[in-house]
UniProtKB/Swiss-Prot annotation:
Binding site for ATP: I16, G17, T18, G19, A20, F21, A22, S23, V24, K38
Catalytic function, reaction form: L-seryl-[protein] + ATP = O-phospho-L-seryl-[protein] + ADP + H(+); L-threonyl-[protein] + ATP = O-phospho-L-threonyl-[protein] + ADP + H(+)
GO MF term list: ATP binding; protein serine kinase activity; protein serine/threonine kinase activity
Family matches, as InterPro entries: Chk1_catalytic_dom (IPR034670), Kinase-like_dom_sf (IPR011009), Prot_kinase_dom (IPR000719), Protein_kinase_ATP_BS (IPR017441), Ser/Thr_kinase_AS (IPR008271)
Database matches in Gene3D superfamilies: Transferase(Phosphotransferase) domain 1
Subcellular location as annotated: Nucleus
Main location as per UniProt: nucleus
Domain of life: Eukaryota
Transmembrane segments: none
Protein name: Serine/threonine-protein kinase chk1
Enzyme Commission number: 2.7.11.1
Domain Protein kinase: 10-272
Amino acid sequence: MAQKLDNFPYHIGREIGTGAFASVRLCYDDNAKIYAVKFVNKKHATSCMNAGVWARRMASEIQLHKLCNGHKNIIHFYNTAENPQWRWVVLEFAQGGDLFDKIEPDVGIDEDVAQFYFAQLMEGISFMHSKGVAHRDLKPENILLDYNGNLKISDFGFASLFSYKGKSRLLNSPVGSPPYAAPEITQQYDGSKVDVWSCGIILFALLLGNTPWDEAISNTGDYLLYKKQCERPSYHPWNLLSPGAYSIITGMLRSDPFKRYSVKHVVQHPWLTSSTPFRTKNGNCADPVALASRLMLKLRIDLDKPRLASSRASQNDSGFSMTQPAFKKNDQKELDRVEVYGALSQPVQLNKNIDVTEILEKDPSLSQFCENEGFIKRLAKKAKNFYEICPPERLTRFYSRASRETIIDHLYDSLRLLAISVTMKYVRNQTILYVNLHDKRKCLLQGVIELTNLGHNLELINFIKRNGDPLEWRKFFKNVVSSIGKPIVLTDVSQN
């Protein structure tokens, strides 16, 4: 899109996300305040669906988001406008990035950290439901963080009004992501109860770094086993949960929506009402630096033990489907507009006079590949904000001193072992590998691996997700990087 629009009151910066017919860009005003602005190409949108249907959906999304404005755990809606070509929606920019980018797959986060974030999630959902609004698409991609590490619920694209002026109605649109969707979603359902179910799956994922099943259908393996044990599972990884966490999760994941916990039951559960050191009286983060440090200390990629296997693989040893989706003609065009959090400018070559070691010593992503406790403690001593330790940029990246040709050869070898096909493109000083695959839950993962020369004999290799579950994308990143290993992956800032 053009960098200037008639009557658009902001300066347009870099793109941070894309959708089927929308693009999200960082924009800033004359006071340098940053916003996330969603631009919808009206011609493209109305070519994919009836113009009237699209207009109603867009109006509903905006109206319901505005209705839920004003809560600290919901992304703020500022305004919307349009011209003949574009419709734009101005939203709060979540400077802390994506919560689930900071969670280790198959490991999860510490229970007190999970309790803090789940309490904020339920505060946001309680507020939405008090307005009669069901989100209906609660999943990791829609849970963001602000600059102090507080949780923000985003994306009202599937939201619906289930209650108005004291009168409730059942909903009937089968929406949401399969691993997080309630079993009754294919029938008429209570919008508030499907949100509770999704929150239960999210809490499970926070604590254990995975979802309990592909989807809640009675003939699928993991969910069938759950049902056979009368929804009181004792097998791995359920047996890793504390009694309190087990109680609240199983209460939220009752297949019968009439027996399932309501939001009121959830927020009054003893596990959630117990104190946590991270929570202030008003529910905000009490110590952003300590919270960021705890999150980062859980992230670890052991390059001394290369592996291509997921601990709960179902398709093959890698955990990814052997039959990968073929690229469609439009896929590469869509992937050219990739999702990248961070500064308003693209990565550029570093100044020749810059001390590269000093730059790398401040990059938290390096802590994944070393004994990270000392690394994180050094950062924490100087940090004043959450994002100085947990950056908004995705952590699925690494540096290398190897030549680009060598790095690409190793990437291709690793992706071949995972049975993932790749296409490649050159853009200025970058090489971009386009990847398209299904994760072990049979959900689509799309993104790019972007190689950028920073100068100083240094390459940045960035795995940038466009579509899919952040936990599964990080698992894919770990599998690839672990198979590449040392000395390609830079683990020591003094490494030559």
